[in-house]
A protein has these predicted regions:
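Extracellular/virion structural assembly segments
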Residues: 2-12, 16-20, 168-178, 185-189, ...
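Preference for solvent-exposed, low-hydrophobicity sequence contexts
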Residues: 1-246
Length: 386
């Protein structure tokens, strides 16, 4: 199995050899099917270093790899990783000792857009099965439950309700990058979460009415209360809490978490939208010397470079302590989106967290845990793409 790399944190390769003089690293970065003998066409970098400390040379490769890892989300949950082959050759000042590389580069590497914390040490590998930190998920009533897993280690995912198995999916390993992360859902369909999304996905037109809303609030086609994620060594249990919200329109936010996987989070309560406008101004000369007059309907104070940006403030609803980690990863994420559903389309909006500081709440100290997070759209109001 390939070694995992989380490229938002440094990743070091150490080559050790008696009397080593220089080391040359060739990095092959690519998607698709893994090949042990990397093609020259996939060679992205060649680095050569001379020995500084006798006996070994160290390369840091995470930033180089991340240049070729592009994360996108358009509503589809896909595996977004890259294969890396790190081939190292050395020269020695004398002798013919064998070089060793740490971590072992024999089976190559699979790079995720994840990161480790300071206290997790160098070259953090993190979980090799479940690709999320929380063991509780708050889901909107009648919405999908989506569990991101690493297929190189996970063997199965089972969904339970009241102790009865609703669905079990076996997870298979793959040599293709498009199957390294699998998003397992209770429905078996990755991309449709709610009744509204299912209507739009089927090409229908969504008609809203109080009777229909009341009916939808009374049913739940994907109800589960536990999910078991199994590897060869252990099983992790995730508790599912279903939330019924009748007053506000819940919003689904999707972000890349610390494991480099897409993760959903519902904001159940009140949301407020606003627009901020910025512009430059100058005082124009509107006097006409030929007539010794000026037009009183003409702007003396002129605006230019006028631009706007939309913002939205969301409230999570009432959570438990387990979601403090989710909030942290959301604010640390560099790719965040929310899904907006109209009568005929499902639109994914890229956003940036404006909230840069958070005080973590606990049920012991605060009783009810609700977070208010501000976001702004990751694009200008007026199209200025050139």
């Amino acid at each position: 199995m390939a070694t995992k790399i989380n490229v938002r944190s440094p990743f070091y390769l150490k080559v050790s050899q008696t009397n080593i003089a220089t080391a040359t690293l060739k990095l092959y970065i690519y998607t698709g099917t893994f090949v042990a003998n990397a093609s020259v066409a996939n060679e992205k970098y060649t680095l050569t270093k001379s020995v500084v400390t006798a006996g070994f040379i160290v390369f840091e490769v995470a930033e180089l790899i991340r240049d070729y890892l592009e994360i996108e989300f358009d509503g589809s949950y896909t595996s977004q990783v890259v294969w890396v082959n790190a081939l190292i050759t050395t020269t020695v000042s004398s002798g013919s000792a064998t070089a060793t590389v740490s971590p072992d580069n024999t089976n190559g590497f699979v790079a995720f857009d994840g990161y480790g914390y300071f206290n997790e040490g160098a070259n953090p590998v993190l979980s090799t099965g479940l690709l999320m930190s929380n063991n509780t998920i708050f889901r909107l009533n009648d919405s999908n439950v989506r569990i991101p897993v690493y297929t190189g280690a996970t063997t199965s995912v089972s969904f339970f309700n009241n102790g009865v198995v609703k669905r079990t999916q076996a997870v298979s390993t793959s040599t293709n990058t498009n199957a390294q992360i699998d998003y397992i859902t209770v429905s078996g369909q990755d991309n449709n979460d709610t009744y509204q999304e299912r209507v739009v996905a089927d090409g229908g037109i969504l008609e809203s009415s109080k009777c229909l809303d009341d009916f939808l609030d009374s049913i739940d086609v994907g109800v589960v209360d536990e999910v078991y994620v199994s590897t060869a060594d252990s099983t992790e249990v995730i508790k599912i809490e279903s939330v019924e919200e009748c007053k506000f329109d819940p919003i689904k936010v999707t972000f890349v978490n610390k494991f480099g996987a897409l993760q959903d989070m519902w904001f159940f309560l009140k949301s407020v939208e606003s627009t901020n406008i910025k512009s430059e101004q100058f005082k124009a000369s509107i006097f006409d010397q030929s007539t010794l007059s000026y037009k009183t309907h003409q702007h003396q104070q002129q605006s230019f470079l006028t631009q706007g940006k939309d913002k939205i403030v969301m409230n999570t609803g009432y959570l438990n302590d387990d979601y403090n980690q989710v909030i942290e990863e959301l604010l640390l994420s560099e790719q965040v989106y929310y899904t907006q559903i109209t009568d005929t389309a499902e639109v994914v909006i890229p956003i940036i967290p404006v909230t840069k500081s958070v005080t973590y709440l606990t049920q012991l100290n605060d009783k009810l845990i609700n977070y208010t997070i501000e976001f702004e759209n990751a694009f200008d109001k007026i199209n200025n793409i050139r």
